[in-house]
């Protein structure tokens, strides 16, 4: 479980100390702030650690980052790479290759490895060492990043829904003790969401599909669903049927494709899923409706930067 994330001088300015979970019963958090405070960037930095996108750390200005998973601590420091560029050139403009990232595991930072951008791009021995350390300490964690803005730009998640429908079909053909409960939660969420003039059908023959409530009972392709409908199905199916134990699901601005009534049900949907599955969910949002104004679940980045207000 991701318990905390601390970053100093994000974009050269912001210092944040985010506590995500304090117990096994505390697995949902919402990161909120106005535009420009780094909500989405924080999700991408977390994703970059767990999914080994280390080149991303050279693109984002920051001084130090500390991420805690259960009892394991990973620390990253962005330092000047003196061998890449003469000092007089570094004073003119900062480029990705002007920096190195120092990785260390543990609270004492006794053992550390420093990577340059060239190390990452050339898949050097030093990169292998860092990846092995990350894998050793965080091997039990899986991280999934769902970007709602990409849902609005592209329709690639329709093909992802086809894959998840096939997965559901396999689960129906080979059920376990939880399958019936998982199906019940999925049906609750779809029913609560009131998809417009359509209903879901679930079968061992095809997994799931949506059918229009017309005389012809027109069967819909996945790409016929709206971006909001796709998002609800994608999140629900992944977290209910595919996410392994202890999975961390990162969701970026789900309200962008949701009507206000759907936003009001979002926390209820997440709680129903998290209550059944041992997964953790971290959501970046502008909308307090998404977390039903339960501010105990929210981390306000603006408030951390302006505690006096």
Where are these regions (language model features)?
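Switch/communication elements of ASCE P-loop NTPase nucleotide-binding domains
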Residues: 1-79, 203-309
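Phosphate-coordinating catalytic segments in nucleotide- and nucleic-acid-processing enzymes
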Residues: 52-224
